[in-house]
């Protein structure tokens, strides 16, 4: 009997008087006890449930009453297996979750190993992560070397051409006496190493050819012009030379 004096749910369902010390009273209250005990009575019977609870210790009876009710509800839905089918389904879910957990652990371990030792997973790691400024410095140094070599070759070619021009003019330019007596009139032809020719005309009164100082000046101007980007070496720099 409950504390309010009304019968418990089991006794109410059985339509009997609930006596003091009823085995069902602590576990089947007045409000919902009747519907819960109806499932137990339908599956196991009231007498079997009473005997089961009576043979258990007091501290285990509440859990046993809940288990009996759950099994009675499962037997109503599946009379053959009852709650066993639910147990199998839950066990399968546990196995699947354990498998997924192992896979995640392995992936986490591999990720940690890859972070700790990147050179083992990727041998080209340090080569790929070479500082960009080192590569740029190497390219710039190579560019300077190439430019310097080209400039050196161009200067060497220019010196050779100018030296050849100097000796060629010294050899192939010969004065001749004109019709004016002491007055020396000369027409000179200069053949450059490139095959082009220019006529050098001059008039002098004493027959002395002053080509050296002016030729040196022209050669110096030609060399400076070539270093500053000039392309015409002979035609623009060597003009008409006068002698006295």
Curated annotation (Swiss-Prot):
Expressed in roots, stems, leaves and flowers. One of its GO terms (biological process) is callus formation. Residues 6-108 form the LOB domain. It holds the Pfam family LOB. Induction: By auxin. Belongs to the LOB domain-containing protein family. This is LOB domain-containing protein 17.
């Amino acid at each position: 009997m409950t504390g309010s004096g009304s019968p418990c749910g089991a006794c109410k369902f059985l339509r009997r008087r609930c006596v003091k010390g009823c085995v069902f009273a602590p576990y089947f209250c007045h409000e919902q006890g009747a519907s819960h005990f109806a499932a137990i009575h339908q599956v196991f019977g009231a007498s079997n449930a009473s005997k089961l609870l009576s043979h258990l210790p007091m501290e285990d009876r509440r859990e046993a009453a809940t288990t009996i009710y759950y099994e009675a509800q499962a037997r109503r839905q599946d009379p053959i297996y009852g709650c066993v089918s639910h147990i199998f389904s839950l066990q399968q879910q546990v196995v699947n979750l354990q498998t997924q957990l192992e896979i995640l652990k392995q992936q986490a371990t591999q990720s940690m190993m890859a972070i700790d030792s990147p050179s083992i997973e990727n041998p080209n790691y340090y080569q790929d992560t070479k500082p960009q400024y080192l590569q740029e410095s190497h390219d710039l140094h190579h560019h300077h070397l190439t430019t310097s070599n080209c400039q050196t070759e161009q200067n060497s070619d220019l010196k050779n051409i100018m030296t050849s021009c100097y000796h060629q003019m010294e050899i192939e330019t010969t004065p001749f006496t004109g019709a004016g007596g002491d007055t020396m009139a000369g027409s000179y032809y200069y053949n450059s190493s490139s095959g082009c020719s220019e006529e050098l005309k001059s008039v002098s009164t004493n027959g002395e050819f002053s080509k050296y100082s002016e030729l040196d000046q022209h050669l110096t101007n030609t060399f400076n012009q070539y270093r500053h980007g000039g392309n015409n070496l002979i035609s623009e720099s060597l003009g008409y030379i006068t002698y006295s």
